[in-house]
Regions:
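Intrinsically disordered, low-complexity RNA-associated tracts
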Residues: 1-49
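His/Asp/Glu-rich metal-coordinating catalytic cores
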Residues: 33-117, 122-330
Length: 330
């Protein structure tokens, strides 16, 4: 999503095993000393009251940037959050491991927050969740795989048994105060991704989440375009759409085409070792690598904490089919 972040006040650094910067670091002067070991004093974020019968959408992250996606919806006394991700620091932030959204407005209004819905399990959508849940106690709604990945994050922070996790699926409806939200299946580079149809007295808002239109997805489950069309016919107040690479001509290649390339490359390699670099969260790509390796009598070694965790969670939840004895240690 693109636009300007409305939260630009003070910034602070949290220390809890990792150095975490809160706020939009790209707006800072890199020559100024703003790293502290303790939380710096912050001005309270004061937004004007929402006009009667109107809905307010606030972007706490994910605007004009890749990372720390977080959107806040407000109607009268009810608020809810969509996603809570992290971003990785730029070169101007030495010593900082990750950047999370500014939670001040959420903390100041936590009694009005009805919950957080997570659209999918990428770091830029779930990576900041544990830091938020240390400060506010709200339920988390997400699909099966996304819940599995969130559990790993919460366990790392000692929060696993302290947070209410609610598993949901496409076409489910959730009521959060004045809002009723329907989940709509979308294709992405990770399974179980959803878009949202958000209904409130002010109108219908569509938030697509991250998506691509893949007519031949690996799992055979294509984006639910008919459901989006139905909402279009009803009339939509606002569309919040993923726009990554929207300025590039053409369309995104189907993941199945990537699998065909693997078969060709494996044949060319013959008995040589093959090293494949991939995003850890791309389960469908990992599945295709495993399938081709198994068909050609090869073993697969997984390197990297994130990838190892995803393979473990994906196999446990049935999103990855791993033949017996194909995985080997390094």
């Amino acid at each position: 999503m693109h636009g300007k972040n409305i939260f630009k006040e003070d910034f602070y650094l949290m220390t809890n095993q990792k150095k975490v910067l809160t706020g939009d670091e790209r707006k800072r002067n890199s020559k100024r000393r703003y790293y502290t070991k303790k939380r710096a004093p912050k001005k309270a974020v004061s937004l004007p009251p929402v006009e009667q019968e109107k809905v307010r959408i606030s972007f706490l992250g994910g605007m004009n940037e890749i990372g720390k996606n977080m959107t806040l919806y407000e109607y009268k006394s009810d608020m809810f959050i969509v996603d809570c991700g992290l971003a990785f620091p730029t070169a101007e932030l030495p010593g900082v491991d990750l950047v999370i959204p500014d939670f001040t407005h959420v903390i100041n209004n936590q009694e009005r927050i009805r919950g957080v819905i997570v659209t999918h399990g990428h770091e830029d959508h779930i990576g900041g969740l544990a830091y938020l849940l240390k400060q506010v106690n709200i339920p988390v709604y997400a699909t099966k795989l996304t819940i599995g990945l969130i559990k790993g994050k919460l366990e790392e922070h000692g929060l696993l048994n302290k947070v209410k996790l609610v598993e949901i699926k496409p076409r489910d409806n959730i009521t959060l105060g004045s809002f009723n939200i329907e989940l709509i299946h979308v294709n992405h580079s990770i399974p179980d991704a959803v878009g949202l149809a958000i209904r409130c007295p002010a109108g219908i808002i569509i938030q697509t989440g991250d998506f691509k239109i893949d007519t031949t997805p690996v799992d055979g489950d294509m984006i639910d375009l008919p459901r989006f069309a139905e909402y279009g016919k009803k009339g939509v107040l606002a569309l919040l759409s993923d726009s990554t690479n929207a300025e590039r001509p053409g369309c995104t290649m189907s993941e199945k085409n990537v699998g065909e390339s693997f078969e060709l490359l494996f044949r060319k390699a013959k008995n040589k070792r093959i090293i494949v670099a991939t995003f850890a969260s791309n389960i469908h790509r990992v599945q295709q690598i495993i399938d081709v390796a198994n068909a050609r009598g090869r073993k697969v070694a997984v390197i990297g904490r994130s990838l190892e965790n995803l393979v473990k969670v994906g196999e446990e939840l049935g999103y990855l089919i791993v033949p017996k004895n194909i995985l080997i240690p390094i």
